[in-house]
Amino acid sequence: MKKTPVVVIVGPTAVGKTKTGIELAKAFDGEIVSGDSVQVYRGMDIGSAKVTKEEAEGIPHHLIDICDPDDAMSVAMFQQLARAAIDDIYARGKLPIIVGGTGLYIRSILYDYEFVERPVDEALREELERLAEVEGREALHQRLVQLDPERAATIHPNNVRRVVRALEVAMQGDTQTTDSAPSEHYDYRLFVLHADREILYDRINQRVDAMMEAGLVEEVERLLAQGYRDTQAMRAIGYKEIIPYVEGKISKDRATDLLKQHTRQFAKRQLTWFRHQFDGIWVDMGRKSFELSYKNIYDDVEGFFRKFRLF
């Protein structure tokens, strides 16, 4: 049975994923499936760099604004929702395009991980807790950074209990799979967008400034007023830096600087993760104009999907 064709656009924040995905959707009659762990939450728009109505240019986007910030969202749940969206898109004769930066979520979509409930591994938990005592909290947190940078960015190193739990999930999953080497669920073409560090960091700094001007502080104030302060969602980069400013603990300049710093560090970890976890086509989005970089992607997608006779 022929697998469903899917295009996947991944990369660090501010590299140009959103624009690339939309241009491909316009060219190939596609729809976007968001692969971002924060954009699923309603009201978390500016801090997650959620696509605006103007930016979307009429292209449908899926898995955005599907739950509240205090709702649970696991990898298994995301996999189920994303695959349902992809199946629906393809059934209507459209091209599914996954766009995002949450590598663990995207891998769960692309590969045949079959999730079942997993009991707590007490031996593993004891070993991780022992490592925290012997090597220290920072060292334990660094292990999580290497395995799951997205999750690590939401947990403070001093919160050993949550670091240990996150490591358990990263090493075993909330669930277990029936295959240690899962097969590919889709016939996909994956592109990793990247740029030289200096160029990428400059874009990140500019994006943060634009987010602050667009009302990120006011967005965080609204979320706090709605009672979401202590939710997992509010520990995401873009929100955890602004909360101390809103609460009068740090200055606005300090909050802005922290957000830039954390976003740059996260982008570096994302690229490292993509390099080790995805076998894709790397596209430099910094040295050439967007048009030239996009044309390389367009030409590849056009050739790849000729065999499906979709276009």
Curated annotation (Swiss-Prot):
It catalyses: adenosine(37) in tRNA + dimethylallyl diphosphate = N(6)-dimethylallyladenosine(37) in tRNA + diphosphate. The record marks T102, R125 as: Interaction with substrate tRNA. Its EC number is 2.5.1.75. InterPro entries: Dimethylallyltransferase (IPR039657), IPT (IPR018022), P-loop_NTPase (IPR027417). Its cofactor is Mg(2+). SUPFAM superfamilies: P-loop containing nucleoside triphosphate hydrolases. GO terms for molecular function: ATP binding; tRNA dimethylallyltransferase activity. Residues 36-39 are annotated as: Interaction with substrate tRNA. Substrate binds at T13, A14, V15, G16, K17, T18. This is tRNA dimethylallyltransferase. It comes from Exiguobacterium sp. (strain ATCC BAA-1283 / AT1b). The lineage of its organism: Bacteria, Bacillati, Bacillota, Bacilli, Bacillales. The gene is miaA.
